[in-house]
Each structure stands twice: as C-alpha cells, then as structure tokens.
Amino acid sequence: MSFILVNPPLFWKLGDSRFSYLDVCRKIGDDPTGLRSLPAEHLGLSSIQAYCAKKGIPVQVVNGIVAEHTSVEPTFAEIEAIVREHGAPTLIGFSGTSHVFQATLRLARMCLERWPNAHTVMGYDFGTLNFEQLLRDYPDIHFVCRGDGEAVFATLAERLANGRGYDDIPGLAYRGSDGRLHANEPAALEIDTLPWPTRNELPQVLRGGFAAGVYASRGCPYRCSYCTLGQTSALFGNKSYRLRSIENVVEEMAYLKKEFGVRHITIVDDLFLTKAPSSQERARDFAEQLLRRDLGLEWMIDARVDSIDRDLFTLLRRAGLRKVFVGVETGSEEQLASYNKRYGLHEETQSDRLKVLRDLQIVIVPGMLMFHPNVTTTEVRQSLQLIDEMGSESHYQMYNRIQLYPGTPLYREYEEKGWAIGEWPVKDWEFRDPRAKGLSDAVLWASIQSGATFQDVRKVFVQHLEAWENNLDITEHSPPSIFDSAALQRSGAA
C-alpha cells in the first residue's frame, strides 16, 4: 500500500525541442542573481508529507518540475518505481495550477489504468476554486481538497486504507454514490502547530542554483480580481490570513543554514508585509530576531508598495533583506482599480516609496502586468515610467501580460465580455488594438534574442510605442507572434 503526491511537469515545446520549466527560468533569467532567489521546492506537498509522517502515514512525493521532466512519461516512471517499492497506491494526490491540468489528467488516467483500485485527489488553488467542474466533468478525479491540504489528505488516506467513510472530512469535495456533488466546508489549520516541510528536494534545488523557501504566513487579506490566492483565502473568513510565529520562522531558517548550508532564503508568502501597524511591528520583530541570532543570511520578501517605510526597511536591510518583490502591476490607477487593487497613494508618493528601496540598495523585483486587452498608449507610458523608477533591468516586466486563472473574478469578467478564448481551464485573450499586439510581440521577440540587454529591449519597446502613439502602422514590420505561433507551446500533456 502506498500514498503518493505528484507535482506534474510543466514544459514548453519549440519545434522538436522541449524545455523544462526550470530550464526556461534559466534561459529568460536576465537578472544574474535572479535564480538564486527563485524557490523551486513544492512546500505545499512537502508540508503534507511532513504532516502525514507525524501521523504515521508514509507518503512519497514525485516532483516533475524539480526533476525537470519534459513529458509525463518520466513522471509516471517515478510513480511506478514507488509502487514497486511500497505497493499499489491507495491514494494519489495531484497539485498544480491550471497550466498543468492536462498533465494531471493524463497522469491520473495512466495511474487508474495501471492500478484501477487507486483513488485520486486534486488540490491547490485550482482545485479549490474549480471543484464542481472537476468532479462533474472529469471522472478520473475522485476527490478535490479545498483549502489546506495537510489534514484533508492525511484523513482521507487513513479512511481509505481502513475502508471507512469520508463524507465528514472538512474541506473534502466528492461525488456521492448517487452521483451528486458534495463539498464540505474547509477548516483553517493553525499553521504554527504544523511540522516544518520535509526538505528531500532541497539538495537538488540548491545544486540547480535555485533558492530555499520558507513560508511565514498563509493566505492574503486582499482580493485582487486576477489572483487565485485571494479567492481561496476568502473561504476562511476572518482566518483568511494566518501567521506563523516569528520565533518558529527564524528557527526554521537557522535549521536550513545549519543542515544545508543555505545562504539565501526566499520567504514565499504572497504577501509578507502590509501597511497595517501589526504587520509592520511583526516585520520589525523578525529583523531584530535575525540580528540577535546573527545568522548571516540574505533573504527576499513580497511586499505591497504602500507598506514601504524608510525606518523599517533600513532595519530589514541590516538584518539581511536584499530583494523585495513589489506587485505594482501597472502605472495606471484606473487599471489598478479595475483589478480591485488600490494603494490610495499619489503617484509621487508611490515613487518616493520605491526610492526608499533603491536608496537602501535593496533590489526591486517588479510585478508588472504590462498588457491586457484594452491597454492604451497612456497606460503603457505610465508603466514604463514606473519601470524606470524601480531601476530593475529585467526584460520580463516589459512583456508580461495578465493571465486568466479559472475561479477568479477576472476570468469570469473576460468570459462574460467575450474576451476569453480557448478551452477551459487555460484560456487566453486577444488585444483589441493590433498595434498593442505589435508592441507586445516585438518586445518579447527582442528579449529572447541571444545577448539582448535590457537597454536593447527597452529601445525596441520605445520605438514601437512611439510608432503606436503617432498612429503609424507597425504591425506588418513586427516579428511573428510568439503567443499565437504554433511553434512555441506551453505543454503539460504531450
């Protein structure tokens, strides 16, 4: 009998060549220090594995992304190897975003063909927000975990192994014997009581040049329309944003340094710091504890621009903060409002906050959503100005576009407006103005050319933007569309 957790592979096909997700990260990593702060472990599956181990349930993990698989076959081969050693699977859990759903589906079918008595369960935000469609339309998915996965997976594994019922497990969605769908309300775990995630993948991750990750919280108090985390967090009501104690977080960081020689750690929270006084004080406590422990670690966080305070960040810098991901998204206040993301800052105030980071020599990793269907030259100019103010020389920020994730308000909005194209769950959109598409394609094309610098890409960006502003037709001089070309495919199934 075995219990298996699977992170399906994500890869791209270009002609006859295939590139793993991590290989693509290396190829587009125009910031030479970027990979060092990119966490590659799947802490969610590692946390479930640790929780189950504490309950006496041995769980094996197959991570197709860390293993850099470029098809589902090697992932399935790893599952087969586990079964040969530990016995036929009772429960197989799948994680991942909508972009690996086809890989998940194919792996589930392969597993059930080989071991027809096995059960399958899906999780992650994608499963949480789309459980009805998954259970209604995909018979190879038997269960869906909504919310925290540790207790759901452990309890379900135990019940199935002992032949007991599972209809009362909090957070479990399933098909009843009559075919009707049932969804139990999720329960928010006290995350400070959870065991630390297992670190079986970390040596391989570090050898690949990627970062160790630590989570200090779960959830998010905000509800941006494009983000799955905010929608998942809403299920927990007043427990939508849960914090670990700073002592627990710092102790785990010290453990990673001692046991694995880690020098850089990325705090993987979607939001480590807000403008709330309690959050600011917690960050101060974090810095002071790191300084007292004298761990000598460098680290990275995600923070909202309205949380940046000079005194606080001066202290954080002393304690090892070297990078901050700031989700500024766009230079347009109107577009931010359409995403339900409001800072309430004047333009000059936002610039002042970003200048604090630059003055302290803290690297800004910008979260830019440069393009959407109705983008205008005015907004693009505003966003370009914001990029210049941040001082980041990453190509990615100049061609990144809004992504549609099923279960979010933005996904529903684009469907209602007829903008979403393609098959569920991975849908795309088209530009309303072909000149915007020309700009987007030209910048992406320039960025993937060998040896292209940030200034090279920025020059192409400005040239095409000025042509658009002056109402010149640049589309016929644009390179082939990367997004529409059949030559470049993001895949998780083939």
Please state what every model-predicted region is.
Residues 90, 142, 263, 322, ...:
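Conserved acidic residues
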Residues 40, 192-364, 385:
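Radical SAM [4Fe-4S] cluster-binding motif and immediate context
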Residues 97, 124, 270-274, 304-305, ...:
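Short, solvent-exposed turn/loop segments enriched in Gly/Ser/Thr/Pro and often Arg
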Residues 3-35, 49, 173, 378-494:
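C-terminal accessory regions of radical SAM enzymes
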Residues 51, 58-185, 398, 407:
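Glycine-rich beta-alpha loop elements in corrinoid/cobalamin-binding modules
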Residues 132-137, 312, 374-388:
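Catalytic cores of alpha/beta
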Residues 2-3, 9-10, 14-19, 24, ...:
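N-terminal [4Fe-4S]-dependent radical SAM core
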